[in-house]
Amino acid sequence: MGISRDSMHKRRATGGKKKAWRKKRKYELGRQPANTKLSSNKTVRRIRVRGGNVKWRALRLDTGNFSWGSEAVTRKTRLLDVVYNASNNELVRTQTLVKSAIVQVDAAPFKQWYLQHYGVEIGRKKKTAAAKKDTPEEGEATTEEAKKSNHVAIKLEKRQQGRTLDAHIEEQFGGGKLLACISSRPGQCGKADGDILEGKELEFYMKKLQRKKGKGAGAAA
């Protein structure tokens, strides 16, 4: 039969059936959802739509452009996991990429940018005193690498003055994964782009995930 968006097949308000008085029209067609999956085998289909226009239907994706709003920087990064969806838990279980889905992305590109921009390595595990004594040569090597020209040092120093980093984001950098929200529509434009979660929004979703984890642990017990 096919998916139809017309109202001819619907019953009347009184409950009676309507008689089909004309055939279906092309402009009343509906298409099945893309249900874009998180997979390394990237697959995007070209779809010709009304007016000769084109839509890009992403069926499988694993990368996207994500922007870090407070730092005004965007980087292409890997999608690692779908962790939350306000509308449907099934979409989390099946790792489906849709608009407004909360995902975990690889923090490495942003870490690299932060080091280059501010000269600060974030998310690095702090070594214990004993470990520091064991590896003195490594420390010497890093100080040699850190030597920069005078004008670069001045530039970095100037940037340091206005530098602020959310404690929750710093914590995430330690784990190498950042929480982000998809803002594009993968089934319509063929891309999974979005924003890194920050501030109140990040706190909100962290609480949601914590609660979900707690429920899961309770059910397992």
UniProtKB/Swiss-Prot annotation:
Which InterPro entries does UniProt cross-reference here? Ribosomal_eS8, Ribosomal_eS8_CS, Ribosomal_protein_eS8_euk, Ribosomal_Se8/biogenesis_NSA2
Q: Which domain of life is it from?
A: Eukaryota
Ranges for the region named Disordered are 1-40, 126-151
Any one Pfam family match given in the protein's UniProt record, by short name: Ribosomal_S8e
Instruction: Provide the family line.
Output: Belongs to the eukaryotic ribosomal protein eS8 family.
Q: Which gene encodes it?
A: RPS8
Q: What is this protein called?
A: Small ribosomal subunit protein eS8
Example of a GO cellular component annotation carried by this entry:
ribosome
A GO biological process of this protein is: translation
Q: Where are the compositionally biased (Basic residues) regions?
A: 8-26
Which region is the signal sequence? none
Which keywords appear in this protein's UniProt record, sorted alphabetically? Ribonucleoprotein, Ribosomal protein
What species was this sequence derived from? Prunus armeniaca
Taxonomic placement: Eukaryota, Viridiplantae, Streptophyta, Embryophyta, Tracheophyta
A Gene Ontology molecular function term of the record: structural constituent of ribosome
Name the PANTHER family on file.
Answer: 40S RIBOSOMAL PROTEIN S8
